Design a protein with these regions (language model features):
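Short, charged N-terminal helix-start/capping segments
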Residues: 1-13, 65-68, 80, 160-163
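An acidic-aromatic substrate-binding cleft motif
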Residues: 3-35, 40-50
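Hydrophobic faces of well-ordered beta-strands that scaffold small-molecule active sites
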Residues: 20-24, 51-53, 87-91, 154-158
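The substrate-binding groove and active-site-proximal loops of carbohydrate-active enzymes
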Residues: 21-33, 54-73, 116-137, 144-146, ...
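Aromatic-lined substrate-binding rim segments of carbohydrate-active enzymes
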Residues: 37-117, 141-144
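Active-site region of glycoside hydrolase catalytic domains
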Residues: 82-88, 96-173
């Protein structure tokens, strides 16, 4: 793999001309790996040249505290990149894993009645939680270190849909 320069905006993959980015979210971790080739083929047929990957993947990337599995993500990023589809890599912090919410229930947000939002959906974390931020930062650092030189990762985005489900947190802090 060749080293890429840092740019403010995503740059085309090596050998491609600049053009408008066209694509969307892709969640390969929610499907059997056997369908990935067909997914990529259909994306190419539709003219897709950029996809966001990893948005809700924290539990699959960090399978337990401090234990990271990037193998599946490496495979799909390479598969996409080799097909000429660039990757906007998400921080995977949109949905914390069950091991985190069980060990640290204080990361869960409360509604106006004081009821705690239970895990099982997305954005069940509270933005004011220092514990959540600490674990999210560890994940982001591990991902950045692992993917810093990957030529197929042309952009990064942190979390997803800020304020969508957890905008009204009535926790004490």
């Amino acid at each position: 793999m060749t080293q890429r320069r840092a740019y403010r905006w995503p740059q085309p993959l090596a050998g491609q001309q600049a053009r408008i980015w066209y694509g969307g979210d892709y969640n390969p971790d929610q499907w059997p790996e056997e369908v990935w080739d067909d997914d990529v083929r259909l994306m190419k047929k539709a003219g897709v040249n950029l996809v966001s990957v990893g948005i809700f993947s924290w539990a699959k990337i960090e399978t337990s505290e401090g234990v990271y599995d990037f193998d599946w993500l490496d495979r799909i990023i390479n598969k996409l990149g080799e097909a000429g589809i660039a990757v906007d890599l998400a921080s995977a912090t949109a949905s914390p894993p069950m091991w985190l919410t069980q060990a640290h229930p204080e990361v869960l947000w409360k509604d106006y009645r004081g009821d705690v939002c239970q895990p099982g959906a997305r954005q069940h974390w509270r933005p004011t939680s220092p514990v959540f931020r600490e674990y999210a930062l560890k994940l982001c650092r591990a991902m950045a270190e692992h993917y810093k030189g990957n030529p197929y990762v042309v952009a990064w985005h942190v979390s997803n849909e800020y304020g969508c489900h957890n905008r009204f947190d009535y926790s004490e802090d």
